[in-house]
Amino acid sequence: MKKINKIFLFIIFLFFSTSFFFTKLLAKENINFLSLKNSEVNLRQGPSFEHPVKLIYKKKYLPILILNKSETWRKTKDFENNSGWIHISQLSKKRSALNMKNNSVLYRKPTIYSKPIAKLEVGRLVLIKKCREKWCKITSGNFSGWIKKNYLWGKIN
């Protein structure tokens, strides 16, 4: 009987520990970024074309954080905390980010001991090719290389 209790307790422990892990994993996945599909996109005060335009974005692939959904509209927030609604036809799944650290170094390989390729200014838009634990391979303008993941704001996962 004691052996069955130990097995039962182990199964319960396993269930709760894995559910905790998956809850954390799902919470991470809920941070959802999209990017702007066009070089001119309206940010509206509400989820319809009748609502006034708050802001006009003029940067294709600018990363946008999705806060909420309403049919064909997404409530969004940008890196400057401007929030409003964008129609889904104006959003893309293209992985992009903004560099948030001034003079961050772009490296040839994902290590600080690699050859530096360029320095990126704050606000520089980058397209994400792939990410590892602490690094992302990006392209920006004519440059392609690796940058530290924690310097980026956008869809890095």
Locations of regions flagged by a protein language model:
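Bacterial N-terminal signal peptides that target proteins for export
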Residues: 1-11
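C-terminal segment of classical bacterial N-terminal signal peptides
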Residues: 15-24
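Compositionally biased, low-complexity segments
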Residues: 13-15, 44
